[in-house]
Amino acid sequence: MYALADVNSFYASCEKVFRPDLRNKPVVVLSNNDGCVIARSPEAKRLGIKMGLPWFQLRSMKFPVPVIAFSSNYALYASMSNRVMVHLEELAPRVEQYSIDEMFLDIRGIDSCIDFEDFGRQLREHVRSGTGLTIGVGMGPTKTLAKSAQWASKEWPQFGGVLALTPGNIRRTEKLLSLQPVEEIWGVGRRISKKLNTMGITTALQLARANPTFIRKNFNVVLERTVRELNGESCISLEEAPPPKQQIVCSRSFGERVTTYEAMRQAVCQHAERAAEKLRGERQFCRHIAVFVKTSPFAVTEPYYGNMASEKLLIPTQDTRDIIAAAVRALDRVWMDGHRYAKAGCMLNDFTPTGVSQLNLFDEVQPRERSEQLMQVLDG
């Protein structure tokens, strides 16, 4: 059995945790540079505020009550996500962080001590008391069914945020799947759901009853796996340690166009610093650092310019100082005066789990002494 814990309205809820005065008030979180709405509290949803609504439009709209908007704070959201993960690990033996606000739990055998849904309510209370955040919990014999149960726990308030689909209650599972649109199934996107609809498959139950071989032939092995999971056959295992990333990218569009080298250098250094921090979080070292800059392709009255340069290091590193220095060298090669830059970023790749490298006899470059200890202090 698997459980899926999903934090309700995660970004908006994180902002509310530290502002008790905002309880029961509509809150939205905006994208980078306050471009558009990327998260809404339940109160904001009830006002009809849509995802992706531009901030300038929202600001001019009239509502019965004031809508409070926050700029996105990803450091806060990552910290709160880690706190939720810690609290779940205190009650479940194995936990996989699927996304910043979703975690899968292995709950096999727990029903010998406590009812599955009672355990789900226990999880909710433990996380709420420890973090101030509310989670929904869906449970099932496969990850896909746990995801469907979690969807239903949100869709119908009478479940109280907790729903278990057990192998012993097939009728309940079939009833839920008959009510779940095929586009709401985990891993079924809009394009695939449209093709399924043309075949007369509009609900999760209809997909579950489809022939797996037929699905594989007409779609792919991934959707075949989904069909098997909907029938209670576990095909997707828990990943306690997700595979290491192959690339880290830190970039951002500028709120105002950048026209000076010093302002661009400062932005690139910030991106490089954040990328180095993420690299250490992955417990990886990198050998390849790239920087890109570009103007806006939509500014038709201005000449477009975009370029990228990279630096390859002799010794893999995760030291912020090395990564910033390489990023600045790359920036110096692509910077051109006279442009109004709209975006810049830093990319790291060519990862290795250690900082060890075979050096040439005549190489003068040596690893920095006590670098690891210094970076640990920097990361706090």
Locate the predicted segments by residue.
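Gly/Gly-Pro- and Ser/Thr-rich, intrinsically disordered tail segments characteristic of DNA damage-repair
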Residues: 1-228, 238, 277, 365-380
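Short, hydrophobic beta-strand segments
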Residues: 103-109, 308-314, 357-363
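DNA-contacting surface of Y-family translesion DNA polymerases
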Residues: 184, 194-340, 356
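C-terminal hydrophobic structural anchor segments
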Residues: 322-379
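Residues at or immediately flanking beta-strands
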Residues: 134-136, 290, 345
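Short, internal active-site loops enriched in acidic
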Residues: 109-110, 141-146, 294-299, 349-354
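Residues in well-ordered beta-strands of folded domains
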Residues: 28-30, 70, 106, 227, ...
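Short Gly/Ser/Thr- and Asp/Glu-enriched loop/turn motifs at secondary-structure junctions
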Residues: 98-102, 140-143, 284-288, 339-343
